């Protein structure tokens, strides 16, 4: 995808900078600015009840009806910092607003990094001073600046009929439905209302980011933001706009899965044959979070017994004597018993498709995306601490 990302649509500028938050010295702040003429903003947030200070603030900003800018910092989550964390995000946003000459509630704030560490306000203000003069066609630098344990920047561009949608994202660990530990910013020069933007974003998140389950942990900071400015002068149909937002979210979700911490396998789990879609989703998530199953995927082992043991724990209607399991479309378990060719199924490739029929004949169906559990995942997360 284009390295321009969030600056691919007309009327958006961005920048990345080093404020010194990360001990590595890598870039750790980004700014995306909507130059108008319209300033539509919509967002979807974490469902974790422990919510970071920037999420609290950005919820208020989005409810205000307009968004002109999004400020990002990486290396510090500003989560679980109590009242001081709330004060700090207000102070930083007020500082940026004074520089941009806009209302503070026209600015969203997003943070990612270590939880429970005080926000280095002085550093971040100095970072703001670097970002503003650097604003331009710098979507790639902004995407680089929001990474934490990511190994590559994640960007997308969707070219439509006279209008464009761009985006960037970050996140490779602590991923589970309710987004993932991730921040995503989408921008478009299409003419849309806030209601249209919110509806499209919510629908897209449900079938992309909310199906991504790397390790069962849900972040305090998840935020997906969509900015629209109408600079193209084009008003797409509802279907056209929904499709573009879905395409962008799906692309970023694929990139998140591919760069998940320690990933050696990309696994898609589809569950059918239960009473409702929600039951199927529960079973798929239960399997996707099961460590024994994930270890089997790391070892390229078509261990259908671990699949049955995992889905048996799910809150879903099933016929325990009639469950079928397929790896890469090859039957390894039929009517809850192994097939003769089960151990010969080749799972040595990066992508593994797992299909489970719970055997009730019901219409319920759902899928999730996950990864294996590797040595590197443990190494990364044992080293990532305060």
Swiss-Prot record:
GO biological process: L-arginine biosynthetic process; ornithine biosynthetic process
UniProt cross-references to CDD domains, sorted A to Z: OAT
Task of the protein: Catalyzes two activities which are involved in the cyclic version of arginine biosynthesis: the synthesis of N-acetylglutamate from glutamate and acetyl-CoA as the acetyl donor, and of ornithine by transacetylation between N(2)-acetylornithine and glutamate.
NCBIfam families per record: ArgJ, PRK05388.1
Subcellular location: Cytoplasm
Protein name: Arginine biosynthesis bifunctional protein ArgJ
EC number(s) from the headed UniProt entry: 2.3.1.35, 2.3.1.1
Annotated residues for binding of substrate: 148, 170, 181, 261, 381, 386
Site feature (Cleavage) residues: 180-181
Entry keywords, A to Z: Acyltransferase, Amino-acid biosynthesis, Arginine biosynthesis, Autocatalytic cleavage, Cytoplasm, Multifunctional enzyme, Transferase
Family: Belongs to the ArgJ family.
Subunit note: Heterotetramer of two alpha and two beta chains.
Catalytic activity: N(2)-acetyl-L-ornithine + L-glutamate = N-acetyl-L-glutamate + L-ornithine; L-glutamate + acetyl-CoA = N-acetyl-L-glutamate + CoA + H(+)
Organism expressing this protein natively: Corynebacterium diphtheriae (strain ATCC 700971 / NCTC 13129 / Biotype gravis)
SUPFAM superfamilies: DmpA/ArgJ-like
Pfam family, one: ArgJ
Active site: 181 (nucleophile)
GO cellular component: cytoplasm
Positions marked as site (Involved in the stabilization of negative charge on the oxyanion by the formation of the oxyanion hole): 112-113
Molecular function in Gene Ontology: glutamate N-acetyltransferase activity; L-glutamate N-acetyltransferase activity
This protein's pathway: Amino-acid biosynthesis; L-arginine biosynthesis; L-ornithine and N-acetyl-L-glutamate from L-glutamate and N(2)-acetyl-L-ornithine (cyclic): step 1/1; Amino-acid biosynthesis; L-arginine biosynthesis; N(2)-acetyl-L-ornithine from L-glutamate: step 1/4
